[in-house]
Amino acid sequence: CIRDRDLMRTGYIRKGVNRRQQKALPKSKPYHYRSTDGIDIYVGKNAAQNDRLTGDARPNETWLHAKDMPGSHVIIRKEGEIPRQTLLEAAILAAWYSKGQNSSGVPIDYTLRRYVKKPGGAAPGMVIYTNQRTLFMTVSESDVRKIQLVEE
């Protein structure tokens, strides 16, 4: 309709994607890394993917995120005791894929997935969590390159 085209052109409305087109779009996958201990680590690339990644994680898997700043959700795909080196590598990834990437001493919170909740009606990627511990990380690109990237 002409009126709709004019409204789109002026920015008052946006062209919508119908449900059939939406389903046809392939969902992107998170970054997949493998720690030096051989444990899989997944890193969300955007808010919607962070929701899926965190929502699909098992309750006893470890979840990490940069404290009080935008960043990727990181999941260590191992239940139970996590080797210290794997935890540090996951924290490096959480710091690198956050707004604190170029800062020193970036606080990275980690907790079990069971303590991460998404409030009803919250924006994509927004969660609240408890029982966390905090690591302070300063990272460089060379630190990230040392961690094996399995799939982009």
Label each PLM-derived region with a short phrase.
Residues 1-4:
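Conserved small/polar residues in nucleotide/adenosyl-binding loops
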Residues 6, 11-152:
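Duplex nucleic acid-engaging cores and interfaces of nucleic-acid transaction enzymes
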